Amino acid sequence: MYLITKVPDDITKKLDEVINKKHTEKANHDLAGNIQQEFLIPDGKPIVWPLIDKCIQAHFEKFPLYYARISGMHKTEQFHLELHSLWVNYQKKYEFNPVHIHDGLFSFVIWHKIPFKMTDEKARFPHMKESEIRAGHFVFLMPNELGHI
């Protein structure tokens, strides 16, 4: 399951301040990306966690049976969620994230500054149907209980 939401402007502004700082703690060793500049940003955790927690709680309220089935979490029980790590990818042209696995029950991505518009990307492939264009897209591969995608 996935959820799409817009990051509020106040959080975006605070996150922008964190992202624009000079970072020194590389995150590449723990990440699958073919990206040269990946840095841990622990200062961003208290900024994004309230939004992420709110989204998770809303999702959990809407789909309690799903989460009970996949994790054993039940609405009547207390449970503690924690943001383990937060990092920023300064992704350049030709860099990419290959198919990879995220551990834990929840993962999220925030696209912060995208240097192009999707309409421009789609215009690069005039010979293709719009539904067939994959460049610039983000894909979740979510297997079922039997491992089928």
Ranges and model annotations:
Residues 84-149:
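Catalytic core of non-heme Fe(II) oxygenases with the double-stranded beta-helix
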